[in-house]
Each structure stands twice: as C-alpha cells, then as structure tokens.
C-alpha cells in the first residue's frame, strides 16, 4: 500500500475557493440520491409503527429527516472536499469544482442540522429529535472525521449512521424505540458493508490515491471478496427477522427469501472471480442490485402494511 493510502490528514488547499453557488449547487450538497433512500426507509419506519400519526406530523417528521440527512451530506462534503477534488467520481462536486466555498457548505449544513433537530423536537417529539441529532453527529464526527481516513472498518462502524432513519421514523410515531425498529436498523447496517465494498472493489484506485483506507486498499481484493461473501451470508437471515418477530407476513418472507438468494448468487460471483475486468463487472452488478434489493425489502414491508397483510404466521414464541 502506498504512503498516500495511509494518510488521514486533510489538505484544504487541494480545491479552489469559489463564490456563492446557485440553488442547484446547494441542493447538490444535500446528496439528493442518498437522501431519497433515507426518506423512503424512514417512511417505512413510520408506516409499520403501531398506533396512528396525523399526516401533517408524519410529513413534518419526514421533512426533518430529509433535511437532517441533507445537512449531514453537506457537512460531509465540507470536510471531505480535499479528497473529493482528487477522485474522478467526486471532482465535480460543488466545493472541489469551486462553485461553493467550504465555509459556505459548513454554514449551510450547520444551519440545516439545527433546523431539522429543533423542528423535529418541537413539532414531533424529542425522542425522534434526539435520534436525529445523534445520527447527524455520528455521520459527521464518528464516520467522516474519525473513521473514514483511519480504518478499513470505516464502512462497518460508520454504516450505522445510514441505518437510523427507520428507527427515527418509528420514534416519530411512538415516542420510543423497540425491537422492531432495531431490526430495521440491523438490516441496513448489515447491508452497508457488501454494498460499499462492491463499489470499493472497482473504485479502489481512487480510494488509494486519496488515502482512504478502504478494505481493498488495505487488505487486498481477495480479502474484500471474502468479506463481501461473509456479510452477505449474514445479511440474508437478518432480513427474515421481521417475519419471525411477527411484523411481516408470508408475502414479505417469500419475496425476501428470493431476493436474498439473488444477493447471495451475485456475492458468490464476486467471491469466485479474480482481479480484473470480470471482478469489476461482478462488483458493479452487486452494487447496482444491492440498491434495488434494499428498496424492495422495505417496499414489501410498506405494501404489507397498506394491504393489511403483515402477520404472525412465522413469529417465534418469545
């Protein structure tokens, strides 16, 4: 591994200082594609939670979660602007491209963070607000500032930040947390490593160049393929827990098992390939499928709730 691959120091001179960007540039700071998945998983958390919630309160909660996720994205782009400037995939982001200054992004993200948390607390409840605040803190401080440039386990631990939205949604309805939202959290938490390591396999050169110790850079591609397979084997049983715990029914269990078989097949395809074009193709295939996979799993929970099909046929006697 090269010296650049173990550096964890920020180089704030690596990108140009621009002026006030357009509304589109500031919207891009929010990482809207990431935000859309966050909103959807939070919506499922709201939908499957017991009890009712006024539609206006539900909308407010989703808005706060979306703004909080966007704020996290803006603060992440502020802190990571130096490495974004040196990666082909991120070089055209607003800060490295000089359309928005780092200071503007930091102020923008901070204001949105405070707005999201305070609005959630005042208009929804303070349990959901506390979880939202912790999520923003975890993503910015624990993942972005501490783990990302220091350890190949950055995705494993830092992935918790992306797993909180359904728990926040649940808390917005109930004012508490329980085993059900924790299971939804666990699904996303276990999904994150194989999802991002698949990306890292065919982008490892970019990560090595900027000193981010992703698993392929530190431990090699063979170990990364092995870890993807192991985490995939752990993920599939976790996705079946909603049925065994009684808040998902036969539709969810059957479809999720089939989706899981597809995930395992693609993970196995990565595991048995050698470095090169075939590995990159297999990794891209799993990366793309993993996004659809998570979306469909949470969609199944939502559909069962809407159709009144969620049942206890598979529930364990706990």
UniProtKB/Swiss-Prot annotation:
Keywords: Cell inner membrane, Cell membrane, Heme biosynthesis, Membrane, Transferase, Transmembrane, Transmembrane helix. Pathway: Porphyrin-containing compound metabolism; heme O biosynthesis; heme O from protoheme: step 1/1. It is a multi-pass membrane protein. The keyword RNA-binding does not apply. It comes from Parvibaculum lavamentivorans (strain DS-1 / DSM 13023 / NCIMB 13966). This is Protoheme IX farnesyltransferase. It comes from the Bacteria. It catalyses: heme b + (2E,6E)-farnesyl diphosphate + H2O = Fe(II)-heme o + diphosphate.
């Amino acid at each position: 591994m090269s010296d650049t691959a173990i550096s964890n120091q920020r180089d704030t001179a690596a990108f140009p200082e621009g002026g006030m960007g357009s509304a589109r540039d500031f919207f891009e700071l929010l990482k809207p594609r990431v935000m859309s998945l966050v909103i959807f998983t939070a919506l499922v958390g709201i939908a499957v939670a017991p009890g009712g919630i006024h539609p206006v309160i539900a909308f407010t909660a989703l808005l706060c979660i979306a703004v909080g996720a966007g704020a996290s994205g803006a603060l992440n782009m502020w802190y990571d602007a130096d490495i974004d400037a040196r990666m082909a995939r991120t070089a055209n982001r607003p800060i490295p491209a000089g359309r928005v200054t780092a200071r503007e992004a930091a102020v923008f993200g901070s204001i949105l963070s405070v707005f999201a948390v305070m609005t959630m607390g005042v208009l929804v409840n303070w349990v959901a607000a506390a979880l939202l605040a912790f999520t923003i803190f975890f993503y910015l401080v624990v993942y972005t500032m501490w783990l990302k440039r220091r350890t190949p386990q950055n995705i494993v631990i830092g992935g918790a930040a992306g797993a909180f939205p359904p728990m926040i949604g649940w808390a917005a309805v109930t004012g508490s947390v329980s085993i059900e939202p924790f299971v939804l959290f666990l699904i996303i938490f276990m999904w994150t490593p194989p999802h991002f390591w698949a990306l890292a396999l065919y982008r490892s050169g970019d990560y090595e160049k900027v000193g981010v110790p992703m698993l392929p850079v530190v431990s090699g591609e063979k170990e990364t393929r092995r870890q993807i397979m192991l985490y995939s084997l752990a993920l599939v049983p976790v996705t079946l827990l909603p049925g065994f715990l009684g808040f998902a029914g036969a539709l969810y269990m059957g479809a999720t098992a089939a989706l899981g078989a597809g995930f395992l097949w693609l993970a196995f395809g990565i595991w048995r390939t050698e470095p090169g074009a075939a590995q990159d193709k297999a990794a891209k295939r799993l990366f793309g499928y993993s996004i659809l996979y998570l979306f469909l799993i949470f969609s199944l929970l939502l559909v069962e709730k809407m159709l009144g099909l969620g049942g206890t046929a598979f529930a364990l006697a706990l």
